[in-house]
Structure formats: structure tokens, C-alpha cells
Amino acid sequence: MAKKKIEAIIKLQVAAGKANPSPPIGPALGQHGVNIMGFCKEFNAKTQGMEPGMPIPVEISVYSDRSFTFEMKTPPASYLIKKAINVKSGSSKPSKEFVGTITRAQLEEIAKVKDPDLTAADLDAAVRIIAGSARSMGVKVEGV
């Protein structure tokens, strides 16, 4: 069987368990002729065990015959950091005002979740990547 030709790659961020045909999903998939409800049902089934509402980056490959496959990534580091320190948003002045403090243990936990999507060589490097994200959000980092 010949390999299908990829016609488009669509990158979206969709809330776990809450995919529906309304924007931004509907228009993004509709313009490529993808079965929108098919994607929504499949995505919601795969994210059933996850925390509802957690943003999940998804990469949808659309083939020339209008079929599709999708790959889910790990949640954004900023979401995981905000969840770990229980804040709604980062600081508007990151290096001057701090919204909270995060420990090395919390950073390690986030790094383990993000590991498949990070290019870090080891856990320590992954922790430093996550710590940098935390600092840029105005979170004080302890133990790194």
C-alpha cells in the first residue's frame, strides 16, 4: 500500500475532554475538509482520564484523502507551574513582582511530566528548563 501524502499539519491547543466543533477547532479542520465530529469524538475519548479543561497541544496531520491522525503533546509548562503554585496567572512584571514560590521537588515533578516533549539530556537539565519558564512568569524558584 502506498504511503498517504500529508496535505497539512494543524497545530491546536484543545481543552481535555472539551473538544467541540465551535471555533477554533471547527474552522481550522473544516478548511482542510476533515471530519470535525470524528476528531472531536476521538480526542475526547483519548483525554477522558485527564483533568477536564487541561490545555493539551495537539498536532493533526491531514492526508490527501481527507483522513487524519493526531498526536497529543504534554500540557504547557506555564499551565503546570500555575497549577503547582495555585495562581491564576503569572506576574505582569516578572523580575520585579513575584506571584509565588516553587520548590525543586515541584519542578522535578513538572519536568517528569514534560520530559517526552523536552530536548533535555537528563532530569537536571529538564528542571533548569522548567525553572527558566517559572522565572519568566514571575515565580520565585527555590533550590535550583
Curated annotation (Swiss-Prot):
The keyword rRNA-binding applies. HAMAP family: Ribosomal_uL11 (MF_00736). GO terms for molecular function: large ribosomal subunit rRNA binding; structural constituent of ribosome. It comes from the Bacteria. Forms part of the ribosomal stalk which helps the ribosome interact with GTP-bound translation factors. This is Large ribosomal subunit protein uL11. Keywords: Methylation, Ribonucleoprotein, Ribosomal protein, RNA-binding, rRNA-binding. The lineage of its organism: Bacteria, Pseudomonadati, Pseudomonadota, Gammaproteobacteria, Thiotrichales. One of its GO terms (biological process) is translation. Part of the ribosomal stalk of the 50S ribosomal subunit. Interacts with L10 and the large rRNA to form the base of the stalk. L10 forms an elongated spine to which L12 dimers bind in a sequential fashion forming a multimeric L10(L12)X complex. One of its GO terms (cellular component) is cytosolic large ribosomal subunit. One or more lysine residues are methylated. Belongs to the universal ribosomal protein uL11 family. Transmembrane segments: none annotated. Pfam families: Ribosomal_L11, Ribosomal_L11_N.
